[in-house]
Amino acid sequence: MIKQSPVKGKDKVKVSFILPGEAVTGTVSVVGDFNGWDPTAHPLRARSNGTRSVAVTLPAQHRFAFRYLDESGRWLDDDAAHGYEENGVGGVNSVVTT
């Protein structure tokens, strides 16, 4: 799931990337164009409602490819992404548009 809210007074958007708690065990991160596909940049944190999430502030009116990556190296897709695109290595990336 993806939630967005504008950052007041700036041309930026706070994007929350959210996964159901049962989707993965162990560490999972959101990786994408916005963080150089670095799995250490944005790990999802467990929430009291059973989900895992992380918020990332991104420039408004841009399109970003992303995926979730768990600690075993398994890629996860976001069923609520704004779109999907081939990633050039035989897979598909999720897309978020701010």
Regions found by a protein language model. Give the residues of each.
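Short, conserved beta-strand segments of beta-strand-rich sandwich/propeller modules, principally
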Residues: 63-65
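Aromatic-rich carbohydrate-binding modules that target alpha-glucans
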Residues: 12-61, 71-98
